[in-house]
Amino acid sequence: MGKYFGTDGVRGVANSELTPELAFKVGRFGGYVLTKDKERPKVLIGRDTRISGHMLEGALVAGLLSIGAEVMRLGVISTPGVAYLTKAMDAEAGVMISASHNPVQDNGIKFFGGDGFKLSDEQELEIERLMDQPEDHLPRPVGADLGMVNDYFEGGQKYLQFLKQSADEDFTGIHVALDCAHGATSSLATHLFADLDADVSTMGTSPNGLNINDGVGSTHPEALAEFVKEKGADVGMAFDGDGDRLIAVDEKGNIVDGDQIMYICAKYLKSEGRLTDNTVVSTVMSNLGFYKALEAEGIKSVQTAVGDRYVVEAMKKGGFTLGGEQSGHLIFLDYNTTGDGLLSAIMLMNTIKMTGKPLSELAAEMQKFPQLLLNVKVTDKHKVTENEKVKAVIEEVEKEMNGDGRILVRPSGTEPLVRVMAEAKTKELCEKYVGRIADVVKAEMGAE
């Protein structure tokens, strides 16, 4: 990670860390790096529903116009919507203003290249290098050479049309409950499933600028679980603030995570001959039960570091079509270039419709190992991998496990946290192991 760019773009507390001044520079220098070979390059900008979105959008637009870019504002739209439209509309770049599942005070800026993919480490480092130069030597067009800004709010409809074409058939007879986290999918999801003839019930669809991800969405699926039972729905779909994640709920109110959705879709795609090389790409956070279930179906797996960008890199390198994370970032590379909650929901609905099985039955085919994840607030998250006492306690626990579980300790990519994860035969063992390691992490580098 660089000085400004983390694992998913530039993030921080809006107007404190991520200021309009910084957003202007990110727009100016980021836009230049992505479009320097083009005359009057086209750049798309979308945002989620956070109160700070307008402020940061204005600053970003100013930065882009200052290098002569033609800016098209998409308004409130999901991150994968921006990625899809950037490629579909032959734009030179796309920008999304969002902090995804983070609380409302945070915001972020992430870029997409003209191919719809997130930036490489090299591109991000080049942007940072230019931002940190003592003087700004970028071109400064004047008069008619300055960029212009236009609104293209019809972009959402173009994206919805693409999603509808991804459905194998309509969803007549399926009652779906949607939780849109008061975020970017609040309007999109409702229209999508209604247009596909599903019976739709909604929650988390009343954004007011302040309530995004507040007790709702994919990071709080228990709210949707209650809603599904209350409405008697067949399936529930929970998205996060920017719509790049999906967590599902079955008809009994049980939560179905990204690993389970990936497994269900992988099995279905394999049966249809649409799973390239019968391989799925996942991260080190995926459950042991996920790998065992794939193996039983004759499906291979490739593991990457945590972060959907690393999953996508491995998918592109190997030519694979399905990958994702337990957190609900699922990538169907035949369809879109990044994690897409709405597309993932369509793919899961395809499987439910075509197999005729309820989600509870499909999910039960994968037996999850008990897993516990604890976040420890620390002063310097990057030192955890070098700390000798932390390494020693991890070795002790792994020796005790004797192959019947695993431990993962890693710094968060976006927050000042160390994540301690354990999988074991029982929940009690998970609690014991995680507590033991977390105590050492806290003692060595814990923050107040």
UniProtKB/Swiss-Prot annotation:
Top-level division of the source organism's lineage? Bacteria
How the cofactor is bound: the record states: Binds 1 Mg(2+) ion per subunit.
Mind giving the lineage of the organism this protein is from?
Bacteria, Bacillati, Bacillota, Bacilli, Bacillales
Give the main EC class: isomerase
Pfam families given in the database record: PGM_PMM_I, PGM_PMM_II, PGM_PMM_III, PGM_PMM_IV
Annotated positions of the Phosphoserine modification: 100
One GO CC annotation, please? cytosol
Q: What is this protein called?
A: Phosphoglucosamine mutase
- Where does the chain bind Mg(2+)? 100, 240, 242, 244
Name the catalysed reactions: alpha-D-glucosamine 1-phosphate = D-glucosamine 6-phosphate
What are its cofactors? Answer: Mg(2+)
| EC number(s) reported in the record | 5.4.2.10
List the NCBIfam families.
Answer: glmM, PRK10887.1
Function per UniProt:
Catalyzes the conversion of glucosamine-6-phosphate to glucosamine-1-phosphate.
Q: Which GO terms describe its biological process?
A: carbohydrate metabolic process; peptidoglycan biosynthetic process; UDP-N-acetylglucosamine biosynthetic process
Q: Which organism is it from?
A: Bacillus licheniformis (strain ATCC 14580 / DSM 13 / JCM 2505 / CCUG 7422 / NBRC 12200 / NCIMB 9375 / NCTC 10341 / NRRL NRS-1264 / Gibson 46)
Does this entry carry the keyword Membrane?
A: no
Q: Which family does it belong to?
A: Belongs to the phosphohexose mutase family.
